[in-house]
Amino acid sequence: MTKPIITFNNVSKTFEDSGTQVLKNINFDLEEGKFYTLLGASGSGKSTILNIMAGLLDASSGDIYLDGERINDLPINKRDIHTVFQNYALFPHMTVFENVAFALKLKKVDKKEIAKRVKETLKMVQLEGYENRSIQKLSGGQRQRVAIARAIINQPRVVLLDEPLSALDLKLRTEMQYELRELQQRLGITFVFVTHDQEEALAMSDWIFVMNEGEIVQSGTPVDIYDEPINHFVANFIGESNIINGTMIEDYLVSFNGKEFESVDGGMRPNEPVEVVIRPEDLQITLPEEGKLQVKVDTQLFRGVHYEIIAYDELGNEWMIHSTRKAIEGEVIGLDFTPEDLHIMRLNETEEEFDARIEEYVEMDEPEDGLINAIEEERNEENL
């Protein structure tokens, strides 16, 4: 990892008036030029992290570093960090040009330089020619672009975005996801994005921090978070999941619904209680006798690209299936899946425990070079 641009070291926050602890020992390093997302439900602490980073709130304990320098006591205007707020915080009585140029005027930048940089920045956010427009006459998407232009015109080290897409309609929100991601990659500035929308996080991020009740419960790439959730909360919060109670018989063998199935997971105790995650899109509908499981279709909804089918097995477990095939309510169908489709979770395992287990398991599972060489020599002798 390169030298971090932002570091949180054991940062906690408690509001003194209520005594409520909203952050609990937050630790992370952010690299330069990446798109990070703080993802969590309302009240999870994600916006509090953003406000502490910006200098709008003080941490109760812990240290915050920017480029290796502690900034806990550094005023907002001295931090090379700019924020795009949920309501954009634009000046309604000013034009687009005046809003974007505001920070440069405070710094007493030359007028010609201001005009040049405003024009360049508006072009970046696809608002070229909007300089003299009134803020009040702009659409929601255009106002957001103005807010982003104002945040990046000084070329800050970090841009913070506090749920800036939440007020937009679905189509515009999707368009802005592409635009924000492309803009961040073009500028090479570190973006820290706050959202409760898991689809936004998965679509835009290099790295996601999943938050719950003031703690980071898992961090990783979008693929890691989706394919390898470490606990029930993450599996349930990120995408749709079928989560079934089971038993890890031994490495690569799990039992649930009274049957044993091959898996690709290991490193757990024999006969340890676990939870098994199967994503709805990984379940294939078959004839009942050909399926690994048999379920009875209860209801279904057409979601445009697939049918969302709800079915129940003989034990009463609910199953969600995504299929391009329409099912018949009341019919019994088979469900097929591969070992790779099963993700096994230990009960109440933390991210640190998960990482340590996987590292230890991989080391134990790797054959030594001496054994590999011996096997190869044996095969060569047999071929002679």
Swiss-Prot record:
Where, by residue number, does ATP bind? 40-47
Q: What is its main location?
A: membrane
Membrane disposition: Peripheral membrane protein
The entry's keywords: ATP-binding, Cell membrane, Membrane, Nucleotide-binding, Translocase, Transport
**EC category name:** translocase
The record's annotation in InterPro entries points to:
AAA+_ATPase, ABC_SmlMolc_Importer, ABC_transporter-like_ATP-bd, ABC_transporter-like_CS, Mo/tungstate-bd_C_term_dom, P-loop_NTPase, PotA-like, Transp-assoc_OB_typ2
- Localization terms from the record: Cell membrane
Q: Which SUPFAM superfamilies match?
A: MOP-like (SSF50331), P-loop containing nucleoside triphosphate hydrolases (SSF52540)
Q: What is its EC number?
A: 7.6.2.11
Claim: rRNA-binding is one of the keywords in the record: no
For the ABC transporter domain, which residue ranges apply?
Answer: 6-238
Superkingdom of the organism of origin: Bacteria
Query: What's one GO MF term for it?
Result: ATP binding
Similarity field: Belongs to the ABC transporter superfamily. Spermidine/putrescine importer (TC 3.A.1.11.1) family.
Assembly: The complex is composed of two ATP-binding proteins (PotA), two transmembrane proteins (PotB and PotC) and a solute-binding protein (PotD).
Q: Which NCBIfam families match?
A: potA
Protein name in the entry: Spermidine/putrescine import ATP-binding protein PotA
Organism lineage string: Bacteria, Bacillati, Bacillota, Bacilli, Lactobacillales
